[in-house]
Amino acid sequence: DAIVAILFPDTTGCPIVQGAFEQGLTDIPWYFTDGVKDSATLIECSQGALEGFKGVAPGVSESAALESFKALYSAATNGENETFIFAPQAYDAAMLMILSAIANGTDGKSIAGGMIAASGGGTPCIGAECIDLALAGEDFDYVGASGPIDLDANGDPTAGTYDIYQIQGSD
């Protein structure tokens, strides 16, 4: 037996966790989603009762593409912020759309139709390198900040990276 909790810390997290713990549901393993991974609020309202509980969230593969993204993000925020959950994935989605628009045209149908090609089959590239290849009319294979990006015939990712996290202390 286990409890899978799909929560958001500032809206549903604390009331649900507190109510469940008041009913004695602390001896059952809990598994959380990405919505509470970085939530100090949920940790505070649980008063330590979440110790050892686990969750799953989008992850990233360490790579040159990720380091490039982190450097760009740091520069854009004047070094004041680290990247956050979903940031690499959102960046990758935007880059695929931008690259497809450059290579195929700027109307919605052209962008959508070119995203699969942008994710594979050409010269592997990161960020601005891909833009240069697209502008030159060359085939390219966008290497994502979140990890390898390969879309299937429906435009769905064929793989992804996930982190399993465990709540420890006040982390």
Spell out what each predicted region is.
Residues 1-171:
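Extracytosolic ligand-binding ectodomains
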